[in-house]
Each structure stands twice: as structure tokens, then as C-alpha cells.
Curated annotation (Swiss-Prot):
Its EC number is 2.7.2.3. The modification Phosphoserine is found at residue 183. Belongs to the phosphoglycerate kinase family. It comes from Bacillus cereus (strain ZK / E33L). The modification Phosphothreonine is found at residue 299. ATP binds at residues 201, 292, 323, 350-353. Monomer. Pathway: Carbohydrate degradation; glycolysis; pyruvate from D-glyceraldehyde 3-phosphate: step 2/5. The lineage of its organism: Bacteria, Bacillati, Bacillota, Bacilli, Bacillales. This is Phosphoglycerate kinase.
Length: 394
């Protein structure tokens, strides 16, 4: 990685404004999944050990520029203190005289959590005045929020105009793993693209067709490709305005020598529920009033075989409606194939794929689970991420 990280700068006694991603799911004031807090711990611990004064900034939810009581970061700061085994202070604002006083009172190794940065309208507008206020608190800016790296906001990008800017350890790892996958992958390199909509994955499919040996398609977006082959798809999801594009992608794969895999059989249903009756049919036999909700058993076997024989697999998007038990088997099978594959480096591209491997208890069998859904998708589209571009080069 050609960006400076916290390993490249002197931190002792320095005030560090560290942007983390503490956007954790909450229910009635309780954190229901603390993965993101845990993901930031190595960076925070490193800063503490190096004798920095650690000022942590994050967003939580979408308060849209105003104070929303249940989106305060107070429970997060409390949990962070427990995980670090030390006293963590919490500010009621994210900048201003009261916060400056708290920062002035900090000793080396102290940790302070600022209030939700999205309580301020200027955050999402990347307002220069707000960025200056953030910068006034610190000597160095550290961006460790890969999950928000695709946003040009005041605390993820704007602040870098006024302070030296480096990556945290989590950001560094994300950029290394995803960067290597795209620039110098081990082969055979397989991408598995699922999810509901073709339109969300156009950029990533187009970019990956230049890089991969195998492209596997699943999820709701597969039915647009099935229809592009001339098959009836019943009530399955379809984007009619993307059928020509699907044809173009299949043609491109052929021209570039990419093995293009799509379902040969699917699980279909007449009702969308936990107790739904399902049938398994060939891809050319979906009845008119049924809809496809998962990949079938033959498809699972084919996909598992491709995975097993790959050196690198990048997975973005589930194979079916995995949140419902009757439609979860395809996604589970892909996860299992990745878990069982020996000598295969597996990169899970955040979002729903990450949620699926967590749900099925396979997370610890994956080589790398990205902490950024949207960010990893944009990175895999070959886009520059504002939260990365703003960091100082080595």
C-alpha cells in the first residue's frame, strides 16, 4: 500500500483525531452486534501504546444533521471502555470549547469518544468549516473507517486538508487485501456476485471481467441473465431494462476467456415466508406464478467445485433470500465451500455476504471479511475512495 499508516509516524504525546466506524446496530439503547467496535481495537490499542492522546470520531445511524438522543455514542463509549479495560471519556459534542477543554486535559494514552459526527449538517456536506473545527482538536488525522471510505465527509476526507493524514491498521489491511486481489491476484481467481439487483453490481461485474478467471452469478440478479438467455422466469426478480446489458456481459466474458457460471437449477416458491413450500426446477422450467428465491442443489455443487479449485475468491452478495430458512441453502453452501476449501484465500465483501457468514457461524473460517459493504463494492469497481485518496503518500 502506498499510503502512510500509523506505523509511519511519531505518535508520542500527539493528539490524534481517529475516524473509526462505530456504526453498530442498536436495539433499545443496547448494542446488538459489536463487530465494528472490535475491528477498531488493534488501531486504538496501538495508538494508546505509542502514547498518543486518542480522540475517536464516528457516525451512528442517519440522524440527518440533528441531535437524535438514541443515536448518541454513549453506549458505544461504555462498551469500548470494557473492551479496552480502561477508562474511556465521552464528550457530549464533537467539537467546540467544551471538547477542546477535555482534549487539553488528556494525558498520553487517554481515550476520548466524540459525539456522533452526523449530528452536524456539515458532516455529510464535507463542510470546510466543520472539518477545520475537527482539525483544531488534533495534530494528526487517522482514518480507520474503511466502511465510510467511499464518502467524502468532513470527518473522513475534509479534515485531511488541515492535518497530516494516515491510515489506521484496519484501513491498511483492507487496502492491502482488496488491492492485492485486484492488482496481483493468485490464480485461478473467482468472483462470486450475488444480491438482488443487477444495477447495483454493474460496475463491479464490468471491472472484474478484466481480472477474473471465473465469474459466478447468483441471487436475485441472476434472473435477469436467465431471461437474457430466452428463458421464462415466472415472478422472479427481473430488471427488464438490464437484459441487453446482461447479454453484453455474457458476450464480454466469452471474448475475455472468463468462465461464466450461472444457475442451472433454482429453488422456487409461491409465497414468501418461513413456512413456504418450495420446489426445485431447471432454469428453463420456472412456472409462470412461481418465483426463484435461491440456487438449486446442482448449481451449489458446480459452484462449490469452482471454489475448491480457486486460489482466490472474492464474494459479494448472497445466492438467495438467506434471511429466510427455506431459501438459505444456496448461500450457506457457498459459505461452506469457502470454509472447507484448502489453500483458497477468501475475501468477503462486507454487507449481506458478511452478515450471511456471521449468521451461519462461518466467519472465523474466512480469510478476510471486509468491514465496508459500499466501500468494498466501490473499491472493486476500480473507483477511488475519498477517504483513501486524502491520505498522505509514503
Amino acid at each position: 500500500m502506498n499510503k502512510k499508516s500509523i506505523r509511519d509516524v511519531d505518535l508520542k504525546g500527539k493528539r490524534v483525531f481517529c475516524r473509526v466506524d462505530f456504526n453498530v446496530p442498536m436495539k433499545e439503547g443496547k448494542i446488538t452486534d459489536e463487530t465494528r467496535i472490535r475491528a477498531a481495537l488493534p488501531t486504538i490499542q496501538y495508538l494508546v501504546e505509542q502514547g498518543a492522546k486518542v480522540i475517536l470520531a464516528s457516525h451512528l445511524g442517519r440522524p440527518k444533521g440533528q441531535v437524535v438522543e438514541e443515536m448518541r455514542l454513549t453506549p458505544v463509549a461504555a462498551r469500548l471502555g470494557e473492551l479496552l479495560g480502561k477508562d474511556v471519556k465521552k464528550a457530549d459534542e464533537a467539537f467546540g470549547p467544551a471538547v477542546q477543554e477535555m482534549v487539553a486535559a488528556m494525558n498520553e494514552g487517554d481515550v476520548l469518544v466524540l459525539e456522533n459526527v452526523r449530528f452536524y449538517a456539515g458532516e455529510e456536506k464535507n463542510d470546510a468549516e466543520l472539518a477545520k473545527e475537527f482539525a483544531a482538536l488534533a495534530d494528526i488525522f487517522v482514518n480507520d473507517a474503511f466502511g465510510a471510505a467511499h464518502r467524502a465527509h468532513a470527518s473522513t476526507a475534509g479534515i485531511a486538508d488541515y492535518l497530516p493524514a494516515v491510515s489506521g491498521l484496519l484501513m491498511e489491511k483492507e487496502l492491502e487485501v482488496l488491492g492485492k486481489a485486484l492488482s496481483n491476484p493468485e490464480r485461478p481467481f473467482t468472483a462470486i456476485i450475488g444480491g438482488a439487483k443487477v444495477k447495483d453490481k454493474i460496475g463491479v461485474i464490468r471491472h472484474l471481467l478484466d481480472k477474473v478467471d471465473n465469474l459466478i452469478i447468483g441471487g436475485g440478479l441472476a434472473y435477469t441473465f436467465v431471461k437474457a438467455l430466452g428463458h421464462e422466469i415466472g415472478l422472479s426478480l427481473c430488471e427488464d431494462d438490464k437484459i441487453e446489458l446482461a447479454k453484453e456481459f455474457m458476450q464480454l466474458a466469452k471474448e475475455k476467456g472468463v468462465n461464466f457460471y450461472m444457475p442451472v437449477d433454482v429453488v422456487i416458491t409461491e409465497e414468501f415466508s418461513e413456512t413456504a413450500t418450495t420446489k426445485i426446477v431447471g432454469i428453463d422450467s420456472i412456472p409462470s406464478n412461481w418465483e426463484g428465491v435461491d440456487i438449486g442443489p446442482k448449481t451449489r455443487e458446480i459452484y462449490a467445485d469452482v471454489i475448491k479449485n480457486s486460489k482466490l475468491v472474492v464474494w459479494n452478495g448472497p445466492m438467495g433470500v438467506f434471511e429466510m430458512t427455506p431459501f438459505a441453502e444456496g448461500t450457506k453452501a457457498v459459505g461452506q465451500a469457502l470454509a472447507d476449501a484448502e489453500g483458497t484465500y477468501s475475501v468477503i465483501g462486507g454487507g449481506d455476504s458478511a452478515a450471511a457468514v456471521e449468521k451461519f457461524g462461518m466467519a472465523d473460517k474466512m480469510s478476510h471479511i471486509s468491514t465496508g459493504g459500499g466501500a468494498s463494492l466501490e473499491f472493486m469497481e476500480g473507483k477511488e475512495l475519498p477517504g483513501v485518496v486524502c491520505l498522505n503518500d509514503k
